[in-house]
């Protein structure tokens, strides 16, 4: 699916998305927030977090990954992010999943806005591949993915950025891990994507959002 791009509106949206994208690497995890300041508090049930406006469910553990962070930069509920992590041996695989409300931007537009910020966190970052991405079993979704190589603390690192256009909602996944974990990490990420792939955030109109 696609949207007509409005240059002026796209620039404003791009600025806000870029600002939000810069928080994962710089911000500490928000864990155990006081209820007054926790935007997810009213929607938590059992071990899962349910985002009220989109209906997206984030379990505490899934596909071997453990949920670590509950973060938001927009208390209206339009932008939020959650981090998952899995350890193979003593090496971590970190995945930041963000769901944002964008207008007039395609998955490729979303990806191109975020890419420079993601690459800036790694030394000698280079693009390994980028292009349209197929979400298995979901022909209805438009997605775009880039895979990058870089270094973190002098250790070769692998990073992928995937933007998905759900319509009213857009999602992105930023996965990072040491390059030596490439094969097992890719397998683990496929399991994580499979665990989420059948979820479809509801549109604002469908969900009757505030």
Predicted stretch roles:
Residues 123-162:
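Signature of long, low-cysteine stretches enriched in small and polar/charged residues
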Residues 28-83:
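N-terminal "mature-domain start" segment
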Residues 172-210:
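Surface-exposed amphipathic alpha-helical segments
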Residues 20-24:
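N-terminal signal peptide c-region/cleavage motif recognized by signal peptidases
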């Amino acid at each position: 699916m696609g949207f007509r791009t409005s240059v002026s509106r796209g620039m404003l949206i791009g600025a806000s998305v870029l600002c939000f994208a810069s928080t994962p690497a710089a911000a500490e995890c928000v864990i155990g927030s006081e209820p007054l300041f926790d935007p997810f508090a009213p929607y938590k049930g059992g071990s899962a977090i349910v985002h009220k406006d989109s209906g997206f469910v984030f379990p505490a553990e899934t596909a071997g990954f453990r949920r670590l962070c509950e973060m938001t930069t927009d208390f209206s509920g339009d932008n939020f992010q959650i981090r998952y992590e899995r350890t193979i041996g003593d090496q971590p695989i970190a995945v930041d999943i963000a769901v944002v409300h964008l207008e007039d931007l395609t998955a490729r537009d979303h990806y191109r806005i975020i890419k420079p910020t993601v690459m800036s966190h790694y030394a000698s970052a280079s693009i390994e591949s980028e292009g349209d991405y197929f979400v298995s079993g979901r022909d209805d979704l438009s997605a775009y993915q880039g895979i990058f190589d870089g270094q973190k603390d002098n250790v070769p690192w692998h990073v992928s950025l995937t933007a998905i256009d759900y319509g009213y909602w857009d999602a992105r996944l930023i996965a990072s891990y040491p390059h030596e974990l490439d094969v097992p990490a890719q397998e683990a990420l496929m399991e994580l994507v499979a665990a989420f792939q059948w979820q479809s955030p509801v549109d604002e109109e469908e969900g009757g959002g505030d």
